[in-house]
Amino acid sequence: MAETSNVLRVNIVTPDGLVYDHHARMLVVHSVAGELGIMANHEPIVTPLEIGEVDVQRVDASDHNDSIAVNGGFMEVSENVASIVADSAERERDIDLSRAQAARDRAQKRIAQAKNDHNQDDLRRAQVALRRAINRINVKTSH
């Protein structure tokens, strides 16, 4: 493994517990301000996250990347630790594509129904559900 001062520890936590905990060369997240690349020795920050893919360039024998579908939350970076707290997060290898596609289809139907009913609350909830489903599909199919 690389020298610890050049390594970033990445952990992702949801209400269900720890989803991810590895050392990385680089972490890429989608914050509300745009895409952020985080490396070791980064200045301390706290930022809210968008629904999107988190890409981790791991530090190990194979130097591979891990992709995690994260549904919002926030990230804190301090002392070579990047901690992401999210409502939900799912590693690419754990995403069930057929379930994600079914969730997308349900959300699209809910959007159509909410528009027909002129129900703005249901429309917003269905749009978020659609973004989450599409995020999971994109993470699963892009690797």
Curated annotation (Swiss-Prot):
It is a peripheral membrane protein. GO terms for cellular component: plasma membrane; proton-transporting ATP synthase complex. Disulfide bonds: none annotated. The keyword DNA repair does not apply. Its main location: membrane. It is found in: Cell membrane. Coiled coil: none annotated. GO terms for molecular function: ATP binding; proton-transporting ATP synthase activity, rotational mechanism. Keywords: ATP synthesis, Cell membrane, CF(1), Hydrogen ion transport, Ion transport, Membrane, Transport. Pfam families: ATP-synt_DE, ATP-synt_DE_N. The keyword Flavoprotein does not apply. Produces ATP from ADP in the presence of a proton gradient across the membrane. F-type ATPases have 2 components, CF(1) - the catalytic core - and CF(0) - the membrane proton channel. CF(1) has five subunits: alpha(3), beta(3), gamma(1), delta(1), epsilon(1). CF(0) has three main subunits: a, b and c. Belongs to the ATPase epsilon chain family. This is ATP synthase epsilon chain. It comes from Lacticaseibacillus paracasei (strain ATCC 334 / BCRC 17002 / CCUG 31169 / CIP 107868 / KCTC 3260 / NRRL B-441) (Lactobacillus paracasei).
